[in-house]
UniProtKB/Swiss-Prot annotation:
Lineage: Eukaryota, Fungi, Dikarya, Ascomycota, Saccharomycotina
GXSXG (motif): residue ranges: 214-218
GO molecular function annotations of the record: lysophosphatidic acid acyltransferase activity; triacylglycerol lipase activity
Stretches with biased composition (Low complexity): 623-633
Name under which the protein is recorded: Triacylglycerol lipase 5
Record field: catalytic activity: a triacylglycerol + H2O = a diacylglycerol + a fatty acid + H(+); 1-(9Z-octadecenoyl)-sn-glycero-3-phosphate + (9Z)-octadecenoyl-CoA = 1,2-di-(9Z-octadecenoyl)-sn-glycero-3-phosphate + CoA; 1-(9Z-octadecenoyl)-sn-glycero-3-phosphate + hexadecanoyl-CoA = 1-hexadecanoyl-2-(9Z-octadecenoyl)-sn-glycero-3-phosphate + CoA
GO annotations of cellular component type: lipid droplet
GO biological process per UniProt: lipid catabolic process; sporulation resulting in formation of a cellular spore; triglyceride mobilization
Keyword terms: Glycoprotein, Hydrolase, Lipid degradation, Lipid droplet, Lipid metabolism, Phosphoprotein, Sporulation
Length: 749
């Protein structure tokens, strides 16, 4: 089988090849007699249902499901918009309005409609009950609304002549209003290999969220996936057969009885059934010494791993590139897999970003030193609330394979969707959900009583967390109940056939949910693509046509080379005062042009502002005339006035512009300083800026009065300071003695 096939098709074909299982049901006498009693239509439906169960790709599965909908008359249900399950009139009205504005090229009204009307669950269109009446898809009006949304975004970014910064700002705010989607993978020991099939199906359908979280076995799969780029994922999935998940240590040279005695002895001595050294070695071979920050910088995926503290007084932690940027991923995975009684609890390790030295996380902190962690599924199998707080996540795709959870969720009415369900089955699910809720509340109350009586309070607290957690999401992917029969494989190293079998089950369980995920996340993913396109367009156009303008004419910054110079300034040097290595760029020494003067120092604002203003009327002192003065002497001077230089930050590098030791004419006197630079006259500053005329393309706001929205995603930022046309020429020279550029947030974004 060639690995040029789609990933899921290759894996499922390989599974049938190794298991000697036919891709279709074999004929039998009973089946032949049963088919004789069916009509031609019923026989065709039966054959298609059998083919659907044994499909080896989503395209094949979806095609068969669509044919079944046509044969059974369910396609007609999709074309009827009227339903009490959602607000179909709202969707109809908004679709018509967007189509009208798009065809009439009224892009400003269209953008206003997007900003004010787009939400994720508009008119309850994400109701799971809308996906129980057909084999695939749902109401046609929902598909029409999402297709029109994509057409609208395409027209805005390709056909409208709007300012790119302005359009980008509106779309970014709309995306924040809609929220993010996160994929959450549960624990489940070797049943966690089920997640591989889920990832393969979502990746092929281009529905992979950026935020991925994993606990225990889910942390293993999520971490391996998140340390590989999008281009590396296909080869990673097709080579899954070559992966050796040597998690549970067994000495193959000894008999099973001898291995059992060793495990019993270890459990009596240490309280654990297995040694975690094979787990550590396996994770090191898969992940290396990558940290959360390094993985995010490499792939752009936000990996989250949950760990539970071994102490009763600590809260569960969600590790990611924000909360634990320097923590080694393999140590977080091993800690998240440390199920009590199975693996010993382990500490976390981090890598020093400067020296690369590996040490225990929090070793310099007395509170965290010698702190150990265990299985993340114990306290927080699905960290939904923390993901919402940190990454604006409001839509969860959950994959649940915990052996004590998914059989109960199969009977829950919150995990339906993607499969046809009769009314009697729905009522049965509802009753089961109520009964489970009753027993769960009673169990929690009983555990609280035992804890108050101080009967093993640590154990009672952990057991209580098992019942208080949320194990499902907006879309929940569950394995078939037949997987319970493989319980004996839970604490064994997976064989190649078992791995392929779990992958096959995961892919097939995901296919019925694809249409739900497409509709729930359609606008979000379309906005992500549009925002990415606009950012690339802005970067390319800015680097070619519109370099960043500073407050002096013809003074520009070349971002790539960090070359900052003014051709009319005599002898400007670029010097780096940080650890990064940058080349020193010198402009040709020229004689100062008439009326032009070298860059002057910018003193910090103080109470002696008026005194400095009067001092400017006197000739400024000439710089040092010693040509042998080394560059290091400039970096060692304490104040900006003494150094006679301008320092500012670009990213992580601190750059310094210094004057060359050339004799230059003194500053001419001027009569009146512009009121714009008086820090105590903010009202007049706004008045002067309003009267200044047109706004350049570098401004965050545009001339449109409908959307005065900043174009910066992580906070507003007035970029008009970079436009020299906003200031008169007499104010240009005055700006050099003011704290005009001494704003820490100017280069922050």
């Amino acid at each position: 089988m060639s690995n040029t096939l789609p990933v899921t098709e290759f894996l499922l074909s390989k599974y049938y090849e190794l298991s000697n299982t036919p891709a279709t049901d074999s004929s039998s006498l009973f089946k032949w007699l049963y088919h004789k009693t069916l009509s031609r239509k019923q026989l065709l439906i039966s054959d298609l249902s059998s083919q659907k169960k044994h499909a080896i790709s989503y395209d094949q599965w979806n095609d068969i499901a669509s044919r079944l909908d046509d044969l059974t008359g369910l396609s007609e249900w999709k074309t009827i918009d009227e339903s009490s399950l959602y607000n179909y009139k709202l969707l109809q009205d908004l679709t018509i309005r967007m189509r009208h504005l798009r065809t009439t090229h009224d892009y400003h009204r269209l953008l206003y409609l997007i900003r004010t009307k787009w939400v994720r669950n508009l008119g309850n269109m994400n109701n799971v009950n809308l996906y129980r009446h057909s084999h695939t898809g749902t109401k046609q009006i929902i598909h029409d609304y999402l297709e029109e949304s994509q057409a609208v975004l395409t027209a805005l970014i390709h056909q409208s002549n709007m300012n790119d910064h302005y359009l980008l700002g509106i779309l970014q705010q709309t995306r924040r209003n809609i929220g993010r989607t996160a994929l959450v993978l549960s624990g489940g020991s070797t049943f966690g290999l089920f997640h591989i099939g889920v990832l393969a199906a979502l990746f092929e359908s281009d529905l992979m969220p950026k935020v991925i979280s994993g606990s225990s076995a889910g942390a293993i799969v999520a971490s391996i996936f998140c340390v590989h780029t999008t281009q590396e994922i296909p080869s990673l999935l097709t080579n899954v057969l070559n992966m050796e998940f040597n998690i549970f240590n067994d000495d193959n040279s000894k008999s099973p009885n001898e291995n059992l005695l060793i495990k019993i002895s270890r459990f009596c001595q240490n309280g654990t059934w297995f040694n975690n050294q094979p787990l550590i070695n396996t994770m090191l071979s898969f992940l290396g010494n990558l940290t959360f920050r390094e993985a995010y910088n490499k792939t752009g995926k936000i990996l989250n791993i949950t760990v539970s503290p071994a102490s009763i007084y600590e809260q569960p932690k969600l590790l990611n590139n924000l909360t634990a940027p320097n923590v080694l991923i393999w140590s977080a995975v091993c800690a998240s897999c440390s199920l009590p009684g199975v693996f010993p609890s382990t500490p976390l390790f981090e890598k020093d970003p400067h020296t690369g030295k590996i040490k225990e996380w929090g070793a310099t902190n007395l509170h965290l030193s010698n702190m150990k962690f265990m299985d993340g599924s114990v306290d927080n199998d699905m960290p939904i609330s923390r993901l919402s707080e940190m990454f604006n996540v409001d839509h969860i795709i959950a994959c649940q394979v915990n052996i004590h959870v998914f059989p109960l969720l199969k009977f829950s009415n919150t995990c339906v969707g993607g499969e046809i369900e009769k009314e009697i089955t729905a009522r049965f699910r509802n009753q089961v959900t109520k009964i489970f809720k009753f027993f769960s509340d009673e169990t929690i109350h009983f555990l609280d009583i035992l804890k108050e009586l101080e009967f093993h309070p640590y154990l009672m607290t952990k057991l209580k967390h098992l019942f208080l957690q949320q194990y499902s999401g907006n879309v929940t992917i569950l394995p078939d109940l037949s997987m319970v029969g493989q319980f004996h494989e839970v604490l064994k190293n997976p064989s190649q056939l078992f791995l392929l079998h779990q992958t096959t089950l995961g892919a097939r369980a995901t296919w019925p949910k694809i249409s739900m995920i497409q509709n729930n996340c359609g606008q979000e993913f379309a906005l992500d693509k549009a925002i990415t396109f606009l950012k690339e367009k802005i970067i390319i156009s800015s680097s070619i046509k519109n370099p960043l303008q500073f407050y002096q004419p013809r003074f520009s910054e070349q971002i790539k080379s960090l070359s900052i110079m003014d051709a009319d300034l005599p002898g400007v040097d670029l010097e780096e005062s940080s650890s990064n290595s940058l080349s020193i760029i010198k402009s040709p020494n020229k004689t100062a042009a008439p009326g032009r003067f070298p860059l002057q120092p910018l003193p910090s604002p103080s109470s002696t502002f008026n005194k400095r203003k009067m001092d400017m009327l006197s000739p400024s002192p000439s710089p040092s005339t010693s040509p042998q003065r080394s560059k290091s002497s400039f970096t060692q001077q304490g104040t900006r006035q003494k150094a006679n230089s301008l320092s500012f930050a670009i990213g992580a590098s601190s750059l310094r512009l210094k004057k060359s030791p050339l004799k230059v004419p003194s500053r001419p006197q001027f009569k009146k300083r512009s009121s714009y630079y008086n820090q105590n006259m903010s009202a007049e500053m706004r008045k002067n800026r309003k009267k200044s005329g047109t706004i350049s393309s570098y401004d965050v706001q545009t001339n449109s009065e409908d959307f005065p929205i900043p174009a910066i995603e992580n906070g507003s930022f007035d970029n008009t300071l970079f436009n020299p046309s906003r200031f008169p020429m007499d104010a240009m020279s005055a700006a050099t003695n003011d704290n005009f550029m001494n704003n820490s947030d100017i280069f922050q974004n």
